[in-house]
Structures are given as structure tokens and as C-alpha cells.
């Protein structure tokens, strides 16, 4: 669990580095949480998604709880589709993640519209594409870390 938390913290630092890109920046934290939900499925990943979402809200200055709601919702869906996602190719997973992330971004726009905050919809679409396109990088990096530290009992 310590390695998982370290990867979340590293994802936070990478998110801070890409913060000036705004909505064009990839969602590093979400991808890391999704990877751990696919690699080691358990209900504790829902709590991890909630905490990560709260951290993202604080860092980005968003409405507190909105990211955690969407993170928990996405991780729940990932856990329900675990058997299907686990055996997909990386490209297929990236397409599925694009759809999930785009829906999350769309719901975020809707939630911000309710509280009278305008968001550039095109930037969210590009951000979803960028996020899905870096999935292979996140997947292979975290898989290497998982195997190196023998997390989950796999060599």
C-alpha cells in the first residue's frame, strides 16, 4: 500500500508541473487510481479514489468533493468491468478510458454550469484525448513498479 501512495504522490507532483496547461493537461491522478483499480481490484480502491479526488479538488481549486465523486464513480465502474478491462489490449483500454474520461469531463461541465462557472468544452475534449493517449505510459510504468516491488503477490 505504501508504494501505491507513493505513486499517487508522484502523480500529484506531475499534476502540479502540468498545472499551467489547465484543462489541456492530462489527468495523471485519475489514471494512476484507475491503474491500481485494474491491477489490484478491491473495494479499498474506492476509498483511495475518494481521497485522491479530494486532493485534486484542493490542488486545482475546484468545488470540494466534485472530483472525488467522479473518481469514485469511475473506479466503481472500473471494478464492475474488471474482468473485461483486464484482458483488453492497451489500445482498447485507452479507448474505453477515453470514453469514461470524456463522460466525466462532460458531467464536470454540467456540474459547473449549475453553479454558473463556464468551462471551455473544447479544452476538455482535448484533455480527454491527451489523458487517454498517455495511458500506455502510465500502464507500463506502474506495471513495472508493481512487479519490481512484488505488489499483489505477482512476480
What are these regions (language model features)?
Residues 1-155:
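Terminal, non-globular segments
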Amino acid at each position: 500500500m505504501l508504494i501505491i501512495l507513493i505513486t499517487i504522490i508522484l502523480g500529484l507532483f506531475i499534476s502540479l508541473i502540468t498545472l499551467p496547461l489547465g484543462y489541456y493537461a492530462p489527468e495523471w491522478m485519475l489514471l494512476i487510481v484507475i491503474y491500481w483499480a485494474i491491477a489490484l481490484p478491491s473495494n479499498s480502491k474506492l476509498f483511495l479514489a475518494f481521497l485522491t479526488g479530494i486532493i485534486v479538488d484542493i490542488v486545482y481549486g475546484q468545488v470540494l468533493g466534485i472530483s472525488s465523486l467522479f473518481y469514485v464513480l469511475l473506479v466503481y465502474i472500473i471494478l464492475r468491468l474488471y474482468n473485461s478491462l483486464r484482458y483488453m489490449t492497451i489500445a482498447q483500454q485507452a479507448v474505453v478510458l477515453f470514453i469514461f474520461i470524456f463522460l466525466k469531463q462532460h458531467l464536470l461541465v454540467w456540474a459547473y454550469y449549475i453553479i454558473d462557472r463556464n468551462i471551455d468544452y473544447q479544452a476538455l475534449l482535448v484533455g480527454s484525448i491527451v489523458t487517454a493517449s498517455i495511458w500506455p505510459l502510465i500502464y507500463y510504468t506502474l506495471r513495472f513498479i508493481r512487479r519490481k516491488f512484488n505488489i499483489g503477490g505477482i512476480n
